[in-house]
């Protein structure tokens, strides 16, 4: 495998903080690196002890094992490499090797990825098992393939989780309780339309801006999976959580397309195996953190409100009928063929 490493290294544009800069010369040779290990910079917006990072750490160990130490990951949490849109742009241009991002900004990445908005519909999945069946199947692969030719190779669906609502004003049990409240959403038109349908005022903000916005009262609340609310310590400034499970939110592992296409068969096998097993590990870690998050935050004084979900489902039906959102109806039908079984 080491004899084949030159091809891979000729394609990797590594900008390391504590190592020589490696870049490809006009003749395809690698300049500025004397290391036998190729390091892929992978960025995410989440906390170092969260399920994204712990999943990447699992993949890191597997990649080192399967490549005999010739490939590894350098993990940058807490938006150290920028917000999710910034990182996707950087990966597509080759100035960053990899990222793990939520699906929120993907529909606006390019015309080809506009169909990803179907995954943002409220109450699309009843449970994680339904989501896995769809995302790991034909529909998921069709969506991943829409990145082909964009500079990004989308490798698979990891997990963010079901998104619940936090605020620091009152218990919210019904959509009527949301009237007039300013709720931070992802920069995603389906999410914004959903909160408008619920009577709230959606305020799109990048993840890195949320905490200060909540502290300063710029927004009244936000929504995220319990695992994120816990590990990002959102509960320190938001003391009410409503268990609405409004959206199932996956995340996607991405690598620069030229780097991936430059792998030898042996390298690709090692990388793909590590990524697939890393995905399984990350999903398990997400469930582990999520299962204990409520009890941990209740012990810290957070008030949880269980809701009649049927009321919320009814309140967002207009989103499914909103033709301005450009939802691919054939893809929605394919998803519902699984979820309605």
Spans of features found by a protein language model:
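Signature of the catalytic double-stranded beta-helix
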Residues: 133-145
